[in-house]
């Protein structure tokens, strides 16, 4: 899904009336239906694949206003894309047991990039509700693609009580064309680590079966602001897995703290 909102103020101390405020919005997302299959090819090795069909609408908005100059009209540019296409994911997983209490799993997933079927438009809005708005809406033939994606993950389980894991994701957005622009995005990377602790799987008390979870991640976004990569993102998550009595269900509760940091 696409969802962001950013603001920037450019101050001109010599000519205050030319100072400008810029706002950037992203909205929309994609829906996905998929069919998957997996096979165990060796004792500890499994492979699988998903093929999916996805569709949806995505809009990117850039708005510029001049707070100190009422005679200069604000300009809003909306770029919209309606997408219908497919996606292929191929993965493999290897699990190794060491003794009675140790288990390690390594997984990898790959998705090739390709061009997407789309209908695109660009809309320019000059003015606002007070001044009146002039709208110029035009369809455009635009190239748009999905990135090559590679993910690698590792997990370790001790005595069925402690699980720790790490994931790394790389998406080659720099090779994706957007609205016929070949250098519209940056490569995206994300690193995530986490742990889950179960006090006593064989315990009789309720608290012995509560799962305690903690995780953190660092992510570099793929989109640019004024030709530069947008702010990096950090996040920390903590939560619990609460077993529901007399069922196999678990109620998961979590909280997340997110911080962005960068020049934009």
Model-inferred region functions:
Residues 1-264:
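Outer-membrane beta-barrel porins/channels
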């Amino acid at each position: 899904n696409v969802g962001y909102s950013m603001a920037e103020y450019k101050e001109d101390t010599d000519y205050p009336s030319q100072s400008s405020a810029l706002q950037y919005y992203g909205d929309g997302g994609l829906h996905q239906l998929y069919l998957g299959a997996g096979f165990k090819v060796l004792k500890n090795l499994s492979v699988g694949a998903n093929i999916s069909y996805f569709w949806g609408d995505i809009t990117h908005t850039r708005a510029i206003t001049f707070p100190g100059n009422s005679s200069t009209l604000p300009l809003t540019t909306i770029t919209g894309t309606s997408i219908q296409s497919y996606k292929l994911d191929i993965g493999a997983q290897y699990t190794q047991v060491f003794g009675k209490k140790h288990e390690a799993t390594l997984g990898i997933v790959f998705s090739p990039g390709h061009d997407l079927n789309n209908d695109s438009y660009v809309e320019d809005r000059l003015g606002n509700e007070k001044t009146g708005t002039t709208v110029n809406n035009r369809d455009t033939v635009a190239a748009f693609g999905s990135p090559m994606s590679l993910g690698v993950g590792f997990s370790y389980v001790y005595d069925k009580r402690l699980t720790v894991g790490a994931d790394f994701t790389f998406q080659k957005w720099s090779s994706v064309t957007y609205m016929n622009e070949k250098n519209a995005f940056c490569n995206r990377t994300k690193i995530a680590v986490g742990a889950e602790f179960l006090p006593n799987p064989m315990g009789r008390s309720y608290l012995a079966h509560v799962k305690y979870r903690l995780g953190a991640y660092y992510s570099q976004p793929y989109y640019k602001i004024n030709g530069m990569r947008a702010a990096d993102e950090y996040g920390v998550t903590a939560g619990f897995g609460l077993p529901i009595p007399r069922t196999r269900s678990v109620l998961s509760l979590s909280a997340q703290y997110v911080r962005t940091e960068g020049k934009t």
